[in-house]
């Protein structure tokens, strides 16, 4: 019924080496493909919001609030400390990151007597206006980041810090 199909030694080795070579090439290319597609495959879900302060405690003067977030890095989970300068600007709540956009130092509110009512970075004399905008002629080239925020049940919840105008 069916004829015997003989395969030569040369064809057998050719098929075997092609198969093994293809498997090895695929195993080398797979990490590169995964690396290239990783940003596309990441979830774009909103970061967990953390309760920081009661809205009733906020004033027109910026106040620093410290809070902690849970950070998962592969198999390692840790608690990371964060800070925010928070104040009311009319009906709006403003939450700014205290990280200077020049070299990553921490800014303070109203701490430089020569420049009152400004955020001041003591490392390289960087200045920011109350709304987080960088003062021209000082080292920072970008405004302070703004935190994602949400008010729920009378409390302010903060998420991820993003550059001004983004989000």
From Swiss-Prot:
Spell out the disulfide connections: 105-123
Among InterPro entries, the record links this protein to: Rieske_2Fe-2S, Rieske_2Fe-2S_sf, Rieske_Fe-S_prot, TAT_signal
Query: Could you name the Gene Ontology cellular component terms for this entry?
Result: plasma membrane
| Top-level taxon of the source organism | Bacteria
Q: Which PROSITE patterns match?
A: RIESKE, TAT
Domain (Rieske): residue spans on this chain: 59-158
Q: Family, per the entry?
A: Belongs to the Rieske iron-sulfur protein family.
Q: Explain the purpose of this protein.
A: Component of the menaquinol:cytochrome c reductase complex. The Rieske protein is a high potential 2Fe-2S protein.
Quaternary organization: The main subunits of the menaquinol:cytochrome c complex are a Rieske-type iron-sulfur protein (QcrA), a cytochrome b (QcrB) and a cytochrome c (QcrC).
Provide the protein name: Menaquinol:cytochrome c reductase iron-sulfur subunit
Gene responsible for this protein? qcrA
């Amino acid at each position: 019924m069916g004829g015997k199909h003989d395969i030569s030694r040369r064809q057998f080795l050719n098929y075997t080496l092609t198969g093994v070579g293809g498997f090895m090439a695929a195993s080398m290319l797979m990490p590169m493909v995964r690396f290239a597609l990783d940003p596309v495959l990441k979830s774009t879900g909103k970061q967990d919001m953390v309760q920081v302060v009661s809205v009733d405690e906020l004033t027109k003067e910026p106040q620093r609030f410290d809070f902690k977030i849970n950070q998962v890095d592969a198999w390692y989970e840790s608690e990371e400390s964060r800070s925010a300068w928070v104040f009311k600007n009319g009906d709006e709540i403003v939450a700014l990151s205290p990280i200077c956009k020049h070299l990553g130092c921490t800014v303070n509110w109203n701490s430089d007597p020569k420049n009152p009512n400004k955020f001041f970075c003591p490392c390289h004399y960087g200045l920011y206006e109350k709304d987080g905008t960088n003062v021209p002629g000082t080292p920072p080239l970008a405004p302070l980041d703004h935190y994602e925020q949400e008010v729920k049940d009378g409390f302010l919840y903060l998420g991820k810090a993003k550059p001004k105008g983004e989000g």
